[in-house]
Amino acid sequence: VTDLLLLHGLTYDHRTWDPVRAELAPGHRVLAPDLPGHGTAPRRASYSLSEVVEVIHARAEAAGLVRPVVAGHSLGAVVATAYAAVHPVSRVVNVDQVLLVGPFGTAVREAVPVLRGPHWRTVWDRMLAGMGIESLPDAARTLVETATDPRPDLLLGYWSEIIERPAEEIEAEAAARLRTITARGAGYHWVTGREPSERYLSWLRAHAPGAAVTVVPGGHFPHLADPARVARIIAG
């Protein structure tokens, strides 16, 4: 039975995977850690992607995971993709995260002065408003609203590379990671909450030709809108 490593999104914690875990067949060894600085995980001075990957890998090794399926939601999918490029995995499941910086990067960079001041929360609230949370079932919506602890140090820390590095550089790295994952024989499955653009699909398949793409309607939280379906995808 496949080992599973489940990584939550920015500001959230391991509880956001509970509905998916409840749908998994027994027998899987599952690790759903809190990302550094989230939940009960210690805060850090830096949340660079490479550091976060190694912290998670240490947890996975300690739990005895062997070539796990690594599933990540949102920022967790960025971590999952980076993880799979440097550590053995059987498959990556990316839940609703495009790997191109695009307009999101522009919005983050423009928001930096506000993020560093007393009104930082307005930036996060504006982003939440576009995530389709209101369309989720009641229990899922409650989970999204409670299994979260936004802080400016988390936002600035995890977005530091978007803030400080050229988008082209970040995107070239993402493409290289996809090619490495493909060369290693690991699968890549993108679960998106909305119909993807042809431009992005072309980019994804240029670097991960065998990538599977599944649309699971549910705004930014398809794993909470339809946990049974996403559990089936993760379990393979």
Regions found by a protein language model. Name each.
Residues 22, 31-71, 75, 232:
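Active-site loop/oxyanion-hole signature of alpha/beta-hydrolase fold enzymes
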Residues 79-83:
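Hydrolases whose catalytic domains are alpha/beta-hydrolase-1, hotdog thioesterase
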Residues 152-210, 214-217, 223:
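Conserved serine/cysteine hydrolase catalytic core
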Residues 85, 89-124:
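Flexible "cap/lid" loop of the alpha/beta hydrolase fold
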Residues 103-105, 121-181:
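Conserved alpha/beta-hydrolase catalytic His-Asp/Glu region
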Residues 12, 74-77:
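Active-site loop->helix "elbow" adjoining a glycine-rich segment at hydrolase catalytic centers
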Residues 224-235:
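Post-His helix in hydrolase/transferase enzymes
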Residues 1-42:
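Conserved HGGG/HGGXW glycine-rich cap/lid loop of the alpha/beta-hydrolase fold
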